[in-house]
Amino acid sequence: MNSFPFQTAQTEEEIHHPSIIFKLQNALYSINSKHVESILSVPDYEKIPNAPNNIIGVFAFRTGMIQILDLRAMLGKVSLQSELTDFQQMIAARRQDHINWVNELERTTQSGETFTLTNNPHKCALGKWYDQFTSDNKGVMFYLKKMEEPHRLLHASIDEIERSKEIADPKARARKQAFILRCARTEYMPKVIQSLEKALDSFQTSVNQAIILVLKDESGEHHIGLMVDEVLAVESFLPSTVQHAFQSIQKSPYIRGIGKCEKVAGDILEIDAASVISSVIHAPAEED
């Protein structure tokens, strides 16, 4: 008896085929290699006007033109492209925030006005975002980590400016403030911006490393491309015998079970290849 209401037993033929273990937005999935014709880097493809959000486009395969499906969209996840766009917009906004911050620090120092923006690196928009941001993209996290110290020093510049106001000699005070502003403008801010841009480059690289799994139906006549984030391993999938409460996942017609494998740690959700393929092959034709 299956432990999961949605779990379907593997066929005898599937048992003798390893599974493709892949990643999709920080979660692990598998699909039996019996249903996989080929594994490709994302090829050049044509977008389809007014296509559903789960159809990325079509590309030439040896059997003709086949559709590329966005498995993220099919499972109710944010698409890779949307995730990249959001990240690009966030980086651009936080970059401009800190350019504006330095501009305002220079202006208020020169005018003698009170600086009203935050001196706390954890309370600016970038700091608030970074403190709660997590990613399994090591490149992104590496460059964001490198941003911490120059970001701290940048915000500490306002405290240094305030202390410099205690210098009695006007010329000495002006020299000190010019030095502080120069460090903020030419050292700390560029390092923050460079780290953000390199984090974005790493994110872009990971998107470019997406993989297409070319699936085939039982007859071998119909094919579709399934876009996934990254292929991790090809090995045996071991269906779980322990009850798990994945209520939202149970509602997906594209998930057939849950299990593990030896080389990749963590729970792995098994994709029902037949359901994915039939969603395209047997999809109702749109009315004119």
Feature annotation, model-predicted:
Residues 29-31, 65-71, 225-226, 265-272, ...:
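Short, structured motif recognition centered on aromatic/hydrophobic residues
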Residues 78-207, 285:
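N-terminal membrane-sensor/transducer module of prokaryotic signaling receptors
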Residues 14, 25, 52, 206-207, ...:
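Short flexible coil/turn linkers enriched for glycine and charged/polar residues
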Residues 55-65, 156-157, 224, 262-270:
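N-terminal assembly/transducer modules of large multi-domain enzymes
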Residues 55, 71-86, 201-220:
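DNA polymerase processivity clamps
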Residues 35-59, 228-264:
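Flexible, small-/acidic-enriched active-site or ligand-binding loops
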Residues 2-53:
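The feature marks the first
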Residues 77-82, 118-119, 208, 224-250, ...:
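Extended intrinsically disordered, low-complexity coil regions enriched in Ser, Thr, Gly, Ala
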